[in-house]
Amino acid sequence: MPIITLPDGSQRQFDNPVSVLEVAQDIGAGLAKATIAGRVNGERHDACDIIEQDATLEIITAKDEDGLEIIRHSCAHLLGHAIKQLFPDVKMAIGPTIENGFYYDVDLDRSLTQEDIDAIEKRMLELAKTNYDVVKKRVTWQEARDTFEKRGEPYKMAILDENIERTAMPALYHHLEYIDMCRGPHVPNMRFCQHFKLQKVAGAYWRGDSKNKMLQRIYGTAWADKKQLAEYLTRLEEAAKRDHRKIGKALDLYHMQEEAPGMVFWHNDGWTIFRELETFVRTKLKQYDYQEVKGPFMMDRVLWEKTGHWQNYADLMFTTQSENREYAIKPMNCPGHVQIFNQGLKSYRDLPIRMAEFGSCHRNEPSGSLHGLMRVRGFTQDDAHIFCTEDQIESEVTSCIKMVYDIYSTFGFTNIAVKLSTRPENRIGSDEMWDRAEAGLAAALAHNGLEYEIQEGEGAFYGPKIEFALRDCLGREWQCGTVQLDFALPGRLDATYVAEDNSRKTPVMIHRAILGSIERFIGIITEEYAGFFPAWLAPTQAVVMNITDSQADYVQKVAKQLSDVGLRVKTDLRNEKVGFKIREHTLRRVPYMLVCGDKEIAEGKVAVRTRKGADLGTFTVEEFAEILKNQVRSRELKLLNEE
């Protein structure tokens, strides 16, 4: 007679073992109809699963995050059901959930077209509309293998052979005539899977191994209701408009080419933004008492072996040889900073030493993962390393956290998710060292009153870290900043200081990055601002234009006046209508357009318009210069009279 304890603390007693759905029915018909699955003693179970002993139970519905994930997982099965009906010879591989959706890897002897995807989606909807029940059956390992052998599913057989114990009882989910294997849980009825959209097809190797066969990966998104789906698709449309690759090309910021995959060719305007970011960060380095250094971008293999990178990071490092010596191009700056620290005797009185670098790093990322500025092979880190005593950890990490929020707020990022990543399986250093490092970061977060999520096993191989993820205007998260404790690397590279008792001690090293990769950060803010950079970042801050040739000299004079006070200004003296010029520079997202006609010349003024079409009236050149200088100096996000 199981006693079921519900989330509100109430209990229900049953005479016999009872399913999750039967408990929901006992509570009420409305809840039963909404039941997708249940959390029994904290673990997710199908609605049909039987509870035999006393347990806690939380009913999962479409309103829960878990419920939405289950809907998406079941939509992957629905995709399998539909494609198997349309293409009976297709071989099914895996179909997991991902953020906002799902995918299924399939093996088909021809490439799927958009027409095929449309047909699959149509068939999925037709099947879902029949509201059929999903039937779960536990079978022996051999029964499962026999089932998939008869159905001609080699990938399912491989999963059984390689990933599932012979003593296990796998769950098979029956979707009418279609059968899939999964840990579950899944929806009890396809009425929950009505709001989805297939999005694209991409290539994916079986098991993620390039030595294996290339499969076709069909991506889709699924939501609990029509409104959620529509809102998500609208966000996708907006994201496509804001794609930094598209905007970067339109604004002539940079380009990439086959001869240098993952490497950025910065054009003048893009490089202007890059340098402005560096200048801004430098002002903060001075404010927070950092010294700026520059290390070599290539060092001998011997050094990388000492640090542990050669053993733990070799696949991502570019290497070369010269005069019988093997070198690695640095994937990160930290070993070089330790070498600088090691030059000359250091005392505890010298600590903390805060060492910063705009370091040019290279990582041999897989070609398939490269994506515009967001995932590159060559990048610049706004990197810093702080050498300190254990007693200084909390205050130094606190200072880093303050600096992170200080810098992010300048760009308008105030919604920041904080995550603490703990020790990975593949790591260096003792457990005791990791205990101290993780406790130190947790203490600093607590001291600053920050809520954070723990990411088990996601730390770097040399230390735990705090990650700062920016949430942009579309609700996406971008992990940029990190603060990482390292008790291991200084010792490996023989870094010491003279302690107060005259003994030699190893300093603690704090790795700190805020923008992360400057390239990637430019990609992020390009999409956040949709290319409408604030005046201080805009490559061209104002364009001065004439109406007729008679104003050309005045235009040149105004432009020189503004340039002389440090503003980035261009002239447009083309023999085109002024409306055409305004439209063109509006498309180029230039913050201000200054029009000079005979009236403006007579008054010694300029007529000012913004890129959003606002007519600000006329100003003397001195007045406008002061306004724009103040906006640049204070790094304002908005233009004049802009909401």
Swiss-Prot record:
Cellular localisation: Cytoplasm
The organism's place on the tree of life at top rank: Bacteria
SUPFAM superfamilies according to UniProt: Class II aaRS ABD-related (SSF52954), Class II aaRS and biotin synthetases (SSF55681), TGS-like (SSF81271), ThrRS/AlaRS common domain (SSF55186)
Cofactor: binding comment: Binds 1 zinc ion per subunit.
EC identifiers of the protein: 6.1.1.3
Cofactor(s) of this protein: Zn(2+)
Location of region: Catalytic: 243-534
Pfam families per the UniProt record, alphabetical: HGTP_anticodon, TGS, tRNA-synt_2b, tRNA_SAD
UniProt enzyme class: ligase
GO cellular component: cytosol
Catalyses which reaction(s): tRNA(Thr) + L-threonine + ATP = L-threonyl-tRNA(Thr) + AMP + diphosphate + H(+)
Xref: InterPro entries: aa-tRNA-synt_IIb, aa-tRNA-synth_II, aa-tRNA-synth_II/BPL/LPL, Anticodon-bd, Anticodon-bd_dom_sf, Beta-grasp_dom_sf, TGS, TGS-like
Entry-linked CDD domains: TGS_ThrRS, ThrRS_anticodon, ThrRS_core
SMART domains in the record: tRNA_SAD
One GO MF term attached to the UniProt entry: ATP binding
Binding site for Zn(2+): 334, 385, 511
Residues in TGS domain copies: 1-61
Keywords on record: Aminoacyl-tRNA synthetase, ATP-binding, Cytoplasm, Ligase, Metal-binding, Nucleotide-binding, Protein biosynthesis, RNA-binding, tRNA-binding, Zinc
Gene Ontology biological process terms in this record: threonyl-tRNA aminoacylation
Record-stated family: Belongs to the class-II aminoacyl-tRNA synthetase family.
Subunit description: Homodimer.
Job of this protein: Catalyzes the attachment of threonine to tRNA(Thr) in a two-step reaction: L-threonine is first activated by ATP to form Thr-AMP and then transferred to the acceptor end of tRNA(Thr). Also edits incorrectly charged L-seryl-tRNA(Thr).
Protein name: Threonine--tRNA ligase
Gene expressing this chain: thrS
